[in-house]
Every structure is written in structure tokens, then in C-alpha cells.
Amino acid sequence: MKSQLLSLAVAVTTISQGVVGQEPFGWPFKPMVTQDDLQNKIKLKDIMAGVEKLQSFSDAHPEKNRVFGGNGHKDTVEWIYNEIKATGYYDVKKQEQVHLWSHAEAAVSANGKELKASAMSYSPPASKIMAELVVAKNNGCNATDYPENTQGKIVLVERGVCSFGEKSSQAGDAKAAGAIVYNNVPGSLAGTLGGLDKRHVPTAGLSQEDGKNLATLIASGKVDVTMNVISLFENRTTWNVIAETKGGDHNNVVMLGAHSDSVDAGPGINDNGSGSIGIMTVAKALTNFKLNNAVRFAWWTAEEFGLLGSTFYVNSLDDRELHKVKLYLNFDMIGSPNFANQIYDGDGSAYNMTGPAGSAEIEYLFEKFFDDQGIPHQPTAFTGRSDYSAFIKRNVPAGGLFTGAEVVKTPEQVKLFGGEAGVAYDKNYHGKGDTVANINKGAIFLNTRAIAYAIAEYARSLKGFPTRPKTGKRDVNPQYSKMPGGGCGHHTVFM
């Protein structure tokens, strides 16, 4: 008997030693995660405390924002890193990278009347260009869309079909002096050219109303435009924060992410403090449980400048490492004040834009979350305008949630979700008014619980989930840019 007890003691010691260093303290004694238990750990007070903390980082600096590489974002990154590290449940790292920051301002007048314009980030500067305005056909995505007399003139282009950067490049190839892109949905237009390019010309954005008025004026006579663009550029060091559970199968990784940066204009509390805090709240709640599959959380940098942080991360993984990631969930703007509950259309049934195999199952899981509670929801398209894009391009199944940005809510949607028709989902989108006061508490709480629901499901088991597609390269979808406004589900505006 003594020898048997000694053998048992040795076995227990060996098992315990095997757990230490691989799994967090107390792991064997934690209950297995379930959907109900993890959701019950989500508290609105914790979520709101988190978004208030992000607001404080913006308020603490003269810039009043959390743009990547700036002080407000540095504070954000350090806080996220330290909060998650302190749990002891995760292996946490900061992934350093350098990206080009750009800030631009524009002044545009037509026939002496000043218009409300915004410069595209990464636009070349322009000092008082004075030229006649001409109109590009279609959406200015092809050389044949530009009039023969474009050289030396400023060209007016409607948003849609291709990126702002491509429009600017095509205008440059046509030897235009500048380009003005106007919105194809109500509201003003601010965006990015996606990076520096010698083909680009000075480029500004206008509202749909102002753009259409200019097109009407040109049809009846000559329009002279004066255009000024001030552009600043700076290489900035910045970081992704990546945290993976110490426990669970690291060859079957469930991954989720949200971008942690804002635009220059404001603190970015809905866009995307809501997603950042949503996944942080779930990350902290998850520490109460054990799981079967490892879960990897990511807080992406520089999303607002062209999905730079997530793209950098995905490109840093070889096919073998990326194949361990069985799916990716994206959460970008989940607390919009005039919200709609939107789920990425993984099966393509609404927009004919399917994600990689497994994306449909992700969509169905979120649908079940809402359906089981009798809560309305609607699909939103994979447009390539948020951080899932780099994953889809490498054939990783993707999905997630979104409560709306600049698109205007319809009367039909009001019947489903409440709110106000004729008003954007987020009227403070990309503006200084995107503060804590901009958050819809009901929306952010519900969507954070939905995140917990999905993570609990996949952390327990991937049974029934399609075999992970072979890692490869693919387009997000050749039709993605044809969505109204460049996307009714994603908001990094480079198209």
C-alpha cells in the first residue's frame, strides 16, 4: 500500500509540474467554460469603466485622440497590455511595427463659394490650385472614365466600385491637377488613400449633396475650383497587443480582435473603444474557466490608416502558424448610438460575398444567439473595410458583429431596432463627438455578451465546424466595393 501511495504521489506531482508553466494557476480546479456561465460574468459596469478609461487617455493629451503612435494610443496599448498580463492567464506580447502617419486638411471652393471638404489622408499637398472642374464617368476607376481634356483640371469623381487611392491614381494618370471624391450616400466624406503613391494627386472629399450640386452646375456651365491641401507625414512606432490563453490546444486556436486606435478627429470611443473593451471584458471573464481550445485575443493598431496592424500581424505568420488559427472573429463598433444588430454575412446569402469555409457557421452561431432571445438582427457584407480582411485573404474563416457607422438608418430598420430614421447609425462617426456619451449601453452590453457566447462555444469545442481551409491567398471578394457607401458593415474608409 505504501508503494502504491508513493507512486500516486509521484504521478500527481508530475502532472502538477506539467501544468505549471503551461496553464495558469488553479487551472485544474476551474470549471469548464459554458456559454451561460461566461455571459453571466459580463457586467455593464465593467464595460463602461473600460470605455471611460479610454476616454481619459484621450482627455489627458492636447490632441484629444487615440490615433496610432500618439500619446493617447500609447497609453491605451500600455493599459491593455498591463491589464491582461496581470491576470496571469495569458501569454501577452506587444508586436512592434512602424507605419507612416498622415494628417491632412483641405479647403475647397467652387465659383467663389466655400464648400465643406476634408482631405484624404496620404494625399499629396496642394497650394492654391485653381482650375476648371470636369466630371469623371462612372466611378473613375478606369482610364476611359476621364475626359480627354482632364489634363491640368480638377476632376469630380463619385465614390464607389474602387478605392479612393485608385481613383486618385487614375486621375494622376490622366494628368489631373487634383481630384474631388463625393459621397454616394447622404453625409460628408472623409477617408484615406491607403498610403503614399507617386501617381496620386491632391485629393479631397465632399458630401453627396455638394458633389451632386457641382455635377449639376458643370452640366449647365463652367465651374472654377480653388483647392488647398495641407498634408503632414511622420513615421511612427506602434504596437499590436496579442494575448493567448496559457491553457488549451495551441494547435486549435480561436482568435478574435478589435482595433485599439482612433482617428485624429476624436477619442474614438465607439470606433473602436467599444470593440476593444468588449473583447477585453470577455478576456477577463474567461480567466474564471478552463477550456479545450486556446483563445487568442488581438488589439490591432493603425486600423484607421488602412488595416495596417492586422495586416502586419497576418503577414508575420507563415502558413504553418496561420493554419493553427481555426477562425477569426472581428468586433468593430459595437455600441453605436442609433444601432442595428448586424452579423457578417458569412454564407453570402444576403450579399453574395461568402467568406472562407466556416464563415457561414460563424454567422449561424451569432444568429442563434439573437434568435434564442427574440432579438432582431440583419446581415452585413464582407467589404474588406475592417481587420478581418487580412485573414480572409489568407483563407481563414471569419465573422463578427457591427452596430453601424455612417450609413443612415431606414424606417424599416427602426421597426426592428428602434432609434431614429434618417439619422446615421453613429452620427459622431470619425468625429470629436465620439465620446463615452456616444455609446449606446444596451447595444454594447448585448454585443459583448454575444462575444462571450461565441468564445465559450468555440473554446469548448470545434466539433461540427468545417475543417480549416488550406491556407492560401484569395480576394476578399471582387464585388465587395459595390456595396452602398463602400460597405454597410465596415468602416475604415478607403473606398
Swiss-Prot record:
One of its GO terms (cellular component) is extracellular region. Its EC number is 3.4.11.-. Binds 2 Zn(2+) ions per subunit. Zn(2+) 1 binds at residues 259, 271, 332. Glycans are attached at residues 142, 235, 272, 352. Zn(2+) 2 binds at residues 271, 304, 430. Residues 130-216 form the PA domain. Its main location: secreted. The gene is LAP2. This is Probable leucine aminopeptidase 2. It is an enzyme of class 3 (hydrolase). Disulfide bonds: none annotated. It comes from Arthroderma benhamiae (strain ATCC MYA-4681 / CBS 112371) (Trichophyton mentagrophytes). Residues 1-21 form the signal peptide. It comes from the Eukaryota. The active site is at residue 303. InterPro entries: M28_fam, M28_SGAP-like, PA_dom_sf, PA_domain, Peptidase_M28. Extracellular aminopeptidase that releases a wide variety of amino acids from natural peptides and contributes to pathogenicity. One of its GO terms (biological process) is proteolysis. PANTHER family: METALLOPEPTIDASE M28 FAMILY MEMBER, PEPTIDE HYDROLASE. One of its GO terms (molecular function) is metalloexopeptidase activity. It is found in: Secreted. The record marks 429 as: Transition state stabilizer.
